[in-house]
Amino acid sequence: MGGIMAPKDIMTNTHAKSILNSMNSLRKSNTLCDVTLRVEQKDFPAHRIVLAACSDYFCAMFTSELSEKGKPYVDIQGLTAATMEILLDFVYTETVHVTVENVQELLPAACLLQLKGVKQACCEFLESQLDPSNCLGIRDFAETHNCVDLMQAAEVFSQKHFPEVVQHEEFILLSQGEVEKLIKCDEIQVDSEEPVFEAVINWVKHAKKEREESLPDLLQYVRMPLLTPRYITDVIDAEPFIRCSLQCRDLVDEAKKFHLRPELRSQMQGPRTRARLGANEVLLVVGGFGSQQSPIDVVEKYDPKTQEWSFLPSITRKRRYVASVSLHDRIYVIGGYDGRSRLSSVECLDYTADEDGVWYSVAPMNVRRGLAGATTLGDMIYVSGGFDGSRRHTSMERYDPNIDQWSMLGDMQTAREGAGLVVASGIIYCLGGYDGLNILNSVEKYDPHTGHWTNVTPMATKRSGAGVALLNDHIYVVGGFDGTAHLSSVEAYNIRTDSWTTVTSMTTPRCYVGATVLRGRLYAIAGYDGNSLLSSIECYDPIIDSWEVVASMGTQRCDAGVCVLREK
């Protein structure tokens, strides 16, 4: 061989594995073994050097002046022979067999013998098995064995799935202190305080004699001022445990005062009036009409916890006058106008598919619709009204994602484009819009059980292109256009009393504005103020009846689709 060859260190990929395999064969044939581990009268031949290399426990045993240092036999207490066999297999093969049946013995044994790899494998296995019925037990198990990452994962899981967790026996069997720790946490994800109150009452009722005295202590961590007045009067006031306790009554009176005396709310701020962080939800804004005076395909995501915007993959077709809803971790972008024609096509974002999500087409609607209203009820998507390029529609259709099919339903009484569609207490409401001649203030509701539309009390103001959302038993209608002016005004419909009230106006007029609810607050997104497209967002707090501007999007737009999705 000619030329000068430089030396090179070469590492093979098989050497370490080959050595392990050879040592395991020597162990199984009891060759060169220099120690025997005795567990439950069963002997396990092994090599001191291998045990010491894998375990600090054995390293200390064989290198210090412990009595076992020179003994040919070592008795191991605190684990079973079956568990010892699994642990030795790991020492010699790098593989551990973890099952639901053995993990509760395997993890403590791994901690005892200081086998970090087995401990980590058990923790990862238990984390993969978390569900609402076992997360509290796994959290305690992890805490006992100082598995910090697993304990935190179980804690987060119990917070994220609180309404389901409290339905299971593990919650009912918690101590008072453990219940307090859970319900006082800001991070539990609930849409309202109702499941928190009900969890406390159910826990007390499970052992009434022993736990009744604990109710006032627990109830102070329920944020009753954030409950609706109706729930306070109809449910909490009727609860016998509450009526029999002066301390509990004081907490209920505080909640009533919070609602009846809004001028005192600023003085009553504290832990019970602070909203929980809620579900890990994000706001998505899709398509619309952009600053280039044409439909756009841009998708942006807002995280209310960080107050930051980021971009997601664009929709496959540019659309304005678009409707959008979320259902089962998917976002549906429905109809709209691409600059040439109104659309019946529907795109779906599978947000669980990968880091950013994947857009794909689903079945088109039966009717082309721009400026249609869209909402969800149960497992279905409902779309009503809209403009097909020649006429406004009274029709409504429903999409079943399980069979990827649209079906026509009963017609509205009035043709509408630019109307809002929202569900409240199982009823679909369609609000305002434009019928081709007039801007509308009329409102009609659809009962899915009868298939019929009926009129309800109209809005105080005619509005088309308004944002509509449900918050605390009230349907809020924000902004829009009344035929002469772009509106900043906001009104709220009480579904219980069939009546409207005016609330504080937005800081900016907004037409073709998106509206949605996130973490107990109402968001008004982008729109057109009569002079320019907007990228600004403002947020309404119903407790203090006030709007504040939050972080702006990167894109100015109106006519966009807006919805909320639970973050991965």
Swiss-Prot record:
Residues 405-568 are annotated as: Interaction with DVL3. Pfam families: BACK, BTB, Kelch_1, Kelch_KLHDC2_KLHL20_DRC7. Keywords: Cytoplasmic vesicle, ER-Golgi transport, Kelch repeat, Repeat, Transport, Ubl conjugation, Ubl conjugation pathway, Wnt signaling pathway. This is Kelch-like protein 12. Substrate-specific adapter of a BCR (BTB-CUL3-RBX1) E3 ubiquitin ligase complex that acts as a negative regulator of Wnt signaling pathway and ER-Golgi transport. The BCR(KLHL12) complex is involved in ER-Golgi transport by regulating the size of COPII coats, thereby playing a key role in collagen export, which is required for embryonic stem (ES) cells division: BCR(KLHL12) acts by mediating monoubiquitination of SEC31 (SEC31A or SEC31B). It is found in: Cytoplasmic vesicle, COPII-coated vesicle. The BTB domain is required for interaction with CUL3. One of its GO terms (cellular component) is COPII-coated ER to Golgi transport vesicle. One of its GO terms (biological process) is protein monoubiquitination. Residues 135-236 form the BACK domain. The keyword DNA-binding does not apply. GO terms for molecular function: identical protein binding. Residues 33-100 form the BTB domain. Gene3D superfamilies: 1.25.40.420, Kelch-type beta propeller, Potassium Channel Kv1.1, Chain A. Ubiquitinated by the SCF(FBXL17) complex, leading to its degradation by the proteasome: ubiquitination by the SCF(FBXL17) complex takes place when aberrant BTB domain dimers are formed.
